[in-house]
């Protein structure tokens, strides 16, 4: 990509992610002047390659599975874009906080937890807005299970051929018109379990969460964390410490 005329932001909680630092290093050597960093702690390697670095207020997370920092990163960029349009999301944050707390603490049906804990593969289906993709990654780190993200209506376009009855598909805010097709293809056809994260009841088991309007993605993400935490606890897993995954997956070194 030719980024010569772009303002470039590099986000790295640790401030030592190799890909981000390598990119800023290349752009600096090419004379690029508009380079900005976003990290979760002060005095990082990334900051030395950026013209200015912003630091999240949530603090550094020790757990391998980053959660609150993921949300604050997204909020930072959403507010930045809003301000460029002469707007702001700051007034919506108190209500968003309440909605997230409810999504994190709502009781999960034990049968839902049991089904997901026993799944061979946990799939997330929905819009490509980052929520399903992020939860698929967190599934690996928190539950030690295989996962995948099925974008849009991918779930009803052939993947059922390789699915198993012990798999679970978590559908995030599905369109009502899609529910019967999902049931026909995956529940009736494969015999697997579908769970929904939604602002309204559906024909499937799941959790109903508050409607946060344009900030709904954060509530969806929190609801997914809630489910994964319950599954991890039920499996006796140390939620904060993965057996193989590292806090900084691909760390920059000077060697």
PLM region descriptions:
Residues 52-168, 236-255:
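Active-site phosphate/pyrophosphate-binding segments
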Residues 1-101, 160, 168-210:
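Glycine-rich phosphate-binding loops that contact phosphosugars or nucleotide phosphates
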Residues 9, 139, 227:
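Terminal peptide-recognition signature
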Residues 37, 144-145, 214-215:
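Short secondary-structure boundary micro-motifs
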Residues 29, 141, 189, 233-234:
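Residues at alpha-helix termini
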Residues 38-39, 108, 133, 154-155, ...:
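Residue-level detector of functional hotspots within protein domains
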Residues 50, 175, 185, 191-255:
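Phosphate-moiety recognition in structured ligand-binding domains
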């Amino acid at each position: 990509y030719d980024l010569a005329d772009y303002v470039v932001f590099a986000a790295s909680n640790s401030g030592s992610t190799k890909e981000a630092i390598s990119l800023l290093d290349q752009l600096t050597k090419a004379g690029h002047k508009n380079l900005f960093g976003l990290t979760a702690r002060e005095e990082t390697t990334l900051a030395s390659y950026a013209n200015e670095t912003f630091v999240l207020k949530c603090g550094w997370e020790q757990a391998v599975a980053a959660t609150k920092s993921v949300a604050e990163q997204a909020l930072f960029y959403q507010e930045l874009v809003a301000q460029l349009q002469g707007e702001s999301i700051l007034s919506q944050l108190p209500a968003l906080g309440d909605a997230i707390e409810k999504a994190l603490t709502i009781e999960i049906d034990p049968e839902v937890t049991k089904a997901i804990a026993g799944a061979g593969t946990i799939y997330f289906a929905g819009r490509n807005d980052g929520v399903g993709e992020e939860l698929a990654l967190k599934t690996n780190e928190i539950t030690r299970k295989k996962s995948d993200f099925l974008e849009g209506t991918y779930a009803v376009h052939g993947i059922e051929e390789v699915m198993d009855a012990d798999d679970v598909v978590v559908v995030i805010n599905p369109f009502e018109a899609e529910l019967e097709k999902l049931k026909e293809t995956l529940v009736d056809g494969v015999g697997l379990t579908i769970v929904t994260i939604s602002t309204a009841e559906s024909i499937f088991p799941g959790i109903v969460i508050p409607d946060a309007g344009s900030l709904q993605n954060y509530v969806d993400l929190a609801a997914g964390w809630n489910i994964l935490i319950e599954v991890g606890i039920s499996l006796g897993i140390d939620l904060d410490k993965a057996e193989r995954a590292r806090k900084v997956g691909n760390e920059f070194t000077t060697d």
